[in-house]
Amino acid sequence: MYKPEFMQKAIEEAKAGIENGDGGPFGATIVKDGQIIATGHNCVLKNHDSTCHGEIDAIRKAEQNLQTHDLTNCELYTTSEPCPMCLAAILWANIQKVYYGCTLEDNEKIGFRDAKFEKLMGDRSHLPENFLEQHDRNLCLELFDEYNQMDKTIY
């Protein structure tokens, strides 16, 4: 069941990342049994790593914290709908549910290419029913607006 405080934590994580110049406005929180297991944010620029998206960063930390590669019974909160790469990692990690704020189209409006990759990879009709659920888009759009007004590197 959706809990807004976990999305707020993802937003805070994303803000910290963009304030440090680490990457885009993408933060994530992983929750298990109502407890935060890990948070992460986009570190593409900081780490010179095109795979270090917020969801991937959070998954890596959660797996280390739990000392397992299997995040069954975990939920992921993210400021944006996962790109195809992140979605694949989420599925590989066995995360049960994803709550997201902004859409791939919102990402494109601030300069990111997620929608392009989505078209290449195909639709999401094969996903389990209600696997992806959108919440708090307006809160996440505020974060995107803030980011869009910054001097930044788009990748």
Please report, for each region that a protein language model flagged, where it lies by residue.
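Zinc-dependent deaminase
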Residues: 1-19, 82, 89-155
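Short, basic and Ser/Thr-rich N-terminal targeting/leader segments
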Residues: 22-26, 72
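Active-site phosphate/pyrophosphate-handling residues
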Residues: 5, 35, 57
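Short beta-strand scaffold segments in enzyme catalytic cores
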Residues: 25-34
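Short secondary-structure boundary/capping segments
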Residues: 28, 67-68, 122-124
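Short beta->alpha transition motifs characteristic of CBS
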Residues: 37-44
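Helix-adjacent hinge/juxtasegments
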Residues: 48-52, 56-93
